[in-house]
Amino acid sequence: MRIAALLCFALLAANMAAAADITVLSGGAIEPGLRAAVAAFEKQSGHAVRVTFNTAPQIQKRVEGGDKFDIVIAPPAVIDPLQKLGAIAAGGPSVGRVGLGVAVREGAAPPDIATTDALRKTVLDADAIVFNRASTGQYFEGLLKRLDLWTAVEGKATRYADGASVLDHVKNGKGRDIAFAAITEILLYKDKGIRFVGPLPADVQNFTSYTASLTPQGSGSAAARELAAFFATAQSKQLFTAAGVE
């Protein structure tokens, strides 16, 4: 019995030694898909993954400031300059892309966004247009300028650092407040007082793509390399797709 107990203890110790903690810094728009993929990876590998979510500008600032993570998942606007600095490795797998959607509070009449002309009228008629200061919001502000709407609506534009704050604002609003946010973030609020109206019209839609890149710290970790490789598998892609990440 004593020998059997010692063998069990030795096996347990070996498994604990083999397991590793992996740290990931990621954009928040892919949170639903990433959490599902990470859960599957943890179950299969025995490794523990700790994920921190930030906006794209915050990710760049943190990595450039010396914060240490094994894997960074972000849009090209962040990945490219960090690669040039040598802060992350090139050639990481794409985890998918996220489109821009429109939302109102539950119970509010859904605005017409079927066409770009309809979207234009909806924006002009809104009491407030609410969007973030991250990748999604940067694109949307640029779109309003291209549609010659920015001057007319700038005064009723409300900006937040992240998508959650955008949706909380609209959820708690009373007028014709409209949120423009990543579709994945909107879907997280579908049972929390937010109604998903739909994606932007195809001719003005924008997809933000996300790439998983190893840092120098992560490149030296077999477990981190294993997770990066997992993101390229069909299983991972299916989990991201099911969560709205194309």
What do the predicted segments below correspond to?
Residues A4-N15:
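Bacterial N-terminal signal peptides
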